[in-house]
Regions:
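Surface-exposed cleft-lining segments at the edges of enzyme active sites
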Residues: 95-104, 142-147, 177-188, 209-214, ...
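Active-site cleft segment of glycoside hydrolase catalytic domains centered on the general acid/base Glu
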Residues: 142-166, 174-208, 222-223
Length: 349
């Protein structure tokens, strides 16, 4: 009896202590004093998401409503069977969806809901490119974006909330970091990096894999990009992307990205291979000789390279240069040359 009585007293004391600890933890989470602890769990450094983490479940989604798909249908209706067959080689591949804002919230949500529903039906993962940051392209061919940082963040939050719970990958603002080395951009460097940091945290809180701008192998030094990426919040992202809308081959891009990844503690990366086929002569705007790269696919194995993607839409103009229409518009003759140039190189090889 005395032993059982002491045991009951001991268990009661332990229960009181546990309840007190639970109450203290609850207070920390909901009170202001626990705000820092709560925020620490609200955003997740990419290292926390590496183990057993599938970034592209089901593989890459082929968008049936892409610009090349629309053009293929139009050519078929017009009876241009040869051109339609060439464009089909582009349209049949998974290509990233570009969200370029500003647009109405209704239009944005309509695009996202439609694409997410179709990707879910196909059992694939869509890739979205955000391209609407203030002072986009620093006044060059693709100038534009939101007028204020606040409006950009509001737009980003809408996208993040909509993507939450869906397999989806976000590539955040091509050129936004690498371009800061230009004289026309230097005045916005600190503001830009801080804005990207805020934006990437938004997606991290909603458990969405984000890649930030990593430039390319022939632009900024890896050490320069590593410093900027840290300031832009890369620790809250999956990693970075390289070669978007550019033409450099996989080998130099992979070597550059591996160096940059090493400087960032092993951050993962993806590479745009949409137009990196052999034959490119060095010009960047609708260049002659460019060819489609290898078809996009996710990569397997224990390396930081997650996927080779088609981020830039093959056939979409780089801008009003070399006979092209405005940036992003369909450039038919250029699209056909990308396909035929790849075919020619394959035949020669």
């Amino acid at each position: 009896m005395p032993f059982r009585s002491r045991r009951r007293t001991l268990l009661t004391s332990i229960g009181v202590i546990l309840l007190a600890c639970l109450a203290a933890v609850t207070f920390l989470v909901v009170s202001g004093s626990g705000g820092a602890a709560h925020r620490a769990h609200a955003t997740r450094p990419w290292q926390d998401a590496q183990t057993n983490h599938q970034v592209f479940p089901g593989g890459l989604w082929v968008n049936p409503g892409s610009l090349p798909a629309e053009e293929e249908q139009l050519l078929s209706k017009e009876g241009d069977v040869t051109a339609a067959a060439l464009v089909q080689q582009i349209a049949s591949q998974p290509i990233a969806v570009w969200l370029t804002g500003p647009s109405s919230r209704t239009a944005l949500l309509s695009t996202l809901h439609r694409d997410l529903a179709e990707a879910k039906l196909a059992g694939k993962t869509p890739v979205f490119v955000l391209y609407a940051i203030p002072d986009r392209d620093c006044g060059n061919y693709s100038a534009g974006g939101f007028p204020t940082n606040a409006s950009y963040l509001s737009w980003s939050e809408t996208i993040a909330r909509t993507l939450r719970g869906h397999p989806a990958v976000v590539l955040m603002e091509p050129d936004s970091i690498a371009m800061l080395g230009r004289s026309s951009c230097t005045s916005i460097t600190k503001t830009r990096l801080h804005l990207l940091d805020e934006a990437v945290r938004t997606y991290s809180r909603d458990h969405i894999d984000v890649y930030l701008d990593g430039g390319n192998s022939h632009w900024q030094k890896a050490s320069v990009m590593a410093t900027r990426l840290r300031e832009a919040g890369v620790k809250y992202a999956r990693g970075f992307f390289t070669n978007v809308s550019n033409f450099y081959g996989v080998d130099p891009e992979r070597a550059y990205a591996d160096r940059l990844s090493g400087m960032l503690g092993g951050a993962h990366f993806v590479i745009d291979v949409s137009r990196d086929g052999p034959g490119w002569a060095g010009s960047w705007c609708n260049p002659d000789g460019a060819a489609l790269g290898q078809n996009p696919h996710i990569t397997l194995g224990d390396t930081p390279l997650d996927a080779l993607l088609w981020v830039k839409t093959p056939g979409a103009s780089d801008g009003t240069c070399n006979g092209g229409p405005a940036a992003g518009r369909w450039y038919q003759s250029y699209a056909l040359s990308l396909v035929t140039n790849r075919e020619a190189h394959h035949s020669a090889g």
